[in-house]
Curated annotation (Swiss-Prot):
Signal peptide from the UniProt entry: none
Species assigned in the record: Debaryomyces hansenii (strain ATCC 36239 / CBS 767 / BCRC 21394 / JCM 1990 / NBRC 0083 / IGC 2968)
EC number: 2.4.2.17
Recorded catalytic activity of this chain's protein: 1-(5-phospho-beta-D-ribosyl)-ATP + diphosphate = 5-phospho-alpha-D-ribose 1-diphosphate + ATP
Protein name: ATP phosphoribosyltransferase
Family affiliation: Belongs to the ATP phosphoribosyltransferase family.
Domain of life of the source: Eukaryota
Length: 304
């Protein structure tokens, strides 16, 4: 079925059909209010509230579908985008900051190899052959892949078993916690790429306004997850000091408070977005500076 022509009135949004990115993708789609129901047997889901069709694809295929203009939007790993050699063919809209891992060179922990230069001329296996070839071309200072002295072969699964089975001297694979590699008797000697899930779009989308709308929703959702709203009261005399602590994303919101009859000093109310991971220290610093009535609120969603 030609989905581009079969669904001409809908933006096609490619998302991973399974694997390490799938569950989080579904959660983010809910967060940006793309409502849908997916049948277990179908890899297409029609949004019930937006002119969008979700296309569930292998993560490795998504950069190609988006880069060639078959889909307007996609979510996949940066590693998959670069492995497909499509980074310059798509718009990299946003790092979604999940699915973080490292593409690493791993060697037997009890072996003699401790640095990548020792692998020149040896056997490497990986499911990321392009990125591996690019790395070793740079290492060997050659431009033509055929002139590589290092052998790089493709293995689709259980890459970590390759060294123990005698297939390879080293592997190049994605590593999240490192526990699987450690259990296989491997250790990292080089990180080729730091990767995470990215929101990408076609360079010539069929629905540019809707692409930008969804992009803004994802940006707002990411900001809501990163920031909290900090409200507090402070004497006007210390305003410059407390604003150094809570400058806000662009600037803080300041409102004058009604002066009580028994007060000699004017007070202001301050509202500012601050990074969630820093909030405890920020509250301590505000209290020390002389602020009071310090309150913190979660941000459900926003537009930035």
């Amino acid at each position: 079925m030609d989905l581009v022509n079969h669904l001409p009135d809908r933006l096609l949004f490619a998302v991973p059909k399974k694997g390490r990115l799938y569950e989080k993708c579904c959660s983010l789609l809910k967060g940006v209010d793309i409502q849908f129901r997916r049948s277990n047997r179908l890899d297409i889901a029609i949004s019930t509230n937006l002119p969008i069709a979700l296309i569930f694809l292998p993560a490795a295929d998504i950069p190609i579908f988006v880069g060639e203009g078959n889909c307007d939007l996609g979510i996949t790993g940066l590693d998959q985008i670069k492995e497909a050699d499509m980074f310059n063919s798509v718009e990299d809209l946003l790092d979604l900051q999940f699915g973080s891992c490292k593409l690493q060179i791993q060697v037997p922990a009890e072996g003699e190899i401790t640095k990548p230069e020792q692998l020149v001329g040896k056997k490497i296996v990986s499911s990321f052959t392009k990125l591996s070839v690019d790395y070793f071309k740079t290492l060997e200072n050659v431009e033509d892949e055929t002139k590589l002295s290092t052998s790089i072969r493709y293995v689709g699964g259980s890459v970590e078993a390759s060294c123990a089975l005698g297939v390879a001297d080293a592997i190049v694979d994605l590593v999240e916690s490192g526990e699987t590699m450690k259990a296989a008797g491997l250790t990292a000697i080089e990180t080729i790429l730091q990767t995470s899930a990215h929101l990408i779009s076609s360079k010539k989308p069929k629905f540019p306004e809707l692409v930008e709308r969804i992009h803004q929703r994802f940006e707002g959702l990411m900001a809501a997850q990163k920031y909290v709203l900090c409200n507090y009261n402070a004497p006007r005399s210390i305003l410059s000091a407390v604003l150094q602590i809570t400058p806000g994303r662009r600037s803080a919101t300041i409102s004058a408070l009604e002066k009580k009859s028994d007060e000699n000093e004017e007070w202001v109310a301050v509202s500012s977005m601050v990074e969630k991971k820093k909030i405890s220290d920020i509250m301590d610093d505000l209290k020390k500076a002389g602020a009071s009535d310090i309150l913190v609120f979660d941000i459900g969603n926003c537009r930035v």
